[in-house]
Design a protein with these regions (language model features):
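A structural signal for alpha-helical segments
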Residues: 37-40, 83-86, 150
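Short, low-complexity N-terminal intrinsically disordered segments enriched in polar/charged residues
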Residues: 27-72
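Active-site micro-motifs of SAM-dependent methyltransferase domains
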Residues: 54, 76, 176
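A beta-strand edge to alpha-helix "cap/lid" segment located at domain peripheries
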Residues: 27-36, 110-190
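Bacterial N-terminal signal peptides
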Residues: 10-22
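A solvent-exposed, acidic/Ser-Thr-rich amphipathic alpha-helical stretch
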Residues: 62-137
């Protein structure tokens, strides 16, 4: 009889424990899992990075080609704590366009070349929002001409959040990471 009571109590405790655990897991929000990226996703995101450099360096379409690489609410951060550009108009201006009218590109000549952007060593990984990435930023010399000490060679990098839209992959957030920090070390500001 004592053994039967002990078994009954053990079973009740086990059932009660399972009910509590089940209720707790049902109430806990499910963490969004990152969907795997396809080979085409990786190609498309790499093309986004390539288009970024060309749109920024050429100020094409008065900077709006650059701005359109972002989501409508996309943000470019100039380092943590630095200024930020939000939305299409501010992003076009960040590329030198918009109200600024691409003056840097118009003034460029052999003696005053435009420093071009090279995004290299891109690492792209799935994330619950779409994908995250980090890469280095390099400014090569132009026609054998160097700019100045702050605009040649490795000048930091980027840390990105990409989302897939009906227009393809776009930047949701991009931070220009300045040395000595390494891309991937920042937490996106809100």
């Amino acid at each position: 009889m004592i053994a039967a009571v002990q078994i009954s109590l053990t079973l009740r405790t086990l059932v009660l424990g399972l009910m509590v655990a089940s209720a707790a897991s049902a109430q806990a929000p499910a963490a969004r899992k990152a969907a795997p990226l396809t080979a085409q996703d990786y190609i498309d995101i790499q093309q986004l990075l390539n288009r970024y450099a060309f749109a920024l360096d050429t100020c094409s379409n008065n900077g709006y080609d650059y701005a359109d690489l972002y989501t409508p609410d996309g943000i470019f951060y100039w380092g943590i704590g630095g200024r930020k550009s939000v939305g299409r108009e501010q992003l076009a201006e960040a590329a030198g366009g918009g109200k600024q009218g691409c003056q840097r590109q118009k003034a460029a000549n052999r003696e005053n070349p435009i420093q071009t952007h090279m995004t290299v060593n891109a690492i792209i990984e799935p994330s619950p929002e779409g994908a995250i990435g980090r890469s280095y930023l390099v400014y090569p010399g132009v026609q054998g001409i160097s700019g100045d000490g702050t605009h040649n060679g490795h000048v930091g990098g980027y840390q990105d959040l990409y989302v897939k839209t009906d227009k393809g992959w776009r930047f949701k957030r991009r931070i220009h990471v300045f040395p000595p920090d390494i891309p991937g070390s920042y937490v996106f500001p809100e």
